[in-house]
Amino acid sequence: GSPGLIPFGRS
């Protein structure tokens, strides 16, 4: 997902 900032899409 996002580049480490927010765990968006990092299930």
Swiss-Prot record:
GO biological process: neuropeptide signaling pathway
InterPro entries membership: Periviscerokinin
Tissue: Expressed in abdominal perisympathetic organs and abdominal ganglia.
A GO-annotated cellular component: extracellular region
Keyword set, alphabetical order: Amidation, Neuropeptide, Secreted
Localization (cell): Secreted
Modified residues annotated as Serine amide in this record: S11
A Pfam family the protein falls into: Periviscerokin
Main location: secreted
Secreted is among the record's keywords: yes
Keyword Transmembrane (UniProt): no
Family: Belongs to the periviscerokinin family.
Function recorded in the entry: Mediates visceral muscle contractile activity (myotropic activity).
Protein name as annotated: Periviscerokinin-1
